[in-house]
Amino acid sequence: IVSDFVGNTPFVKLSEKLYAKLESVNPGGSIKDRPVKWILDKSEQMGLINKNSTIVEATSGNTGISLAMMGAERGYKIKIVMPCDMSEERKTLLKMYGAELIEVDEGDFDGAIALKDKLVHDKGYFPLNQFSTPLNIECHYKTTFKEIVSHSLKIGKSITAFIAGTGTGGTLMGIQKGFSEYEPRVKIVAVEPLESPVMSGGEKGLHGIQGIGDGSKFLVDLKKVDEIITISTEDAKIRAKELCKN
């Protein structure tokens, strides 16, 4: 099945001292395949969901795509609550996988989460809860972190810093937990949009870097983060294009 191919993504050399984990090769196209599969697997094992379950989640897109894909694979009904300003490609993919898309105002992740919670309360839907479940952190601690260490040992390189764009905070905190035990000197760096610098102490705002900067720090424990970097939407686009060319 498709979800059997989640994880074990390539370690790509970008420069002499910089490597990237290529999460885009996951079946759903993003790192969000990992926590979605992990949460579904754990929920099935605990008997919290079955073939008659309807699963709902608030998302900026990637988690929704992963959930819609795996929902189609496993036979679940999927409902996705998403701000209306997310890309049309994401909306199309969700619908192609058979998910029902419910849109809220642009950039309104608080509203998306509130509506998701209301559907859980009123309809009895099962919430994935990517923004709050410790399973999100556990997933990256048990899988992504171990893969990073394994890759570094294979190429004979020591890791001095880990940098991640931050949405729910699951990736960042899972990797941080791993390095706190394995090599505490590794620097943990979070990246967020300049237009919505919530972790930096600023106000949330609209931005164009879909997938990070969802308006709150959510799972992020700032005491465990060594540095926070902000980047503008325009600069992020320029750098992404440069990376693709090189």
Language-model segments: what does each one mean?
Residues 1-246:
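PLP-dependent amino-acid enzyme catalytic core
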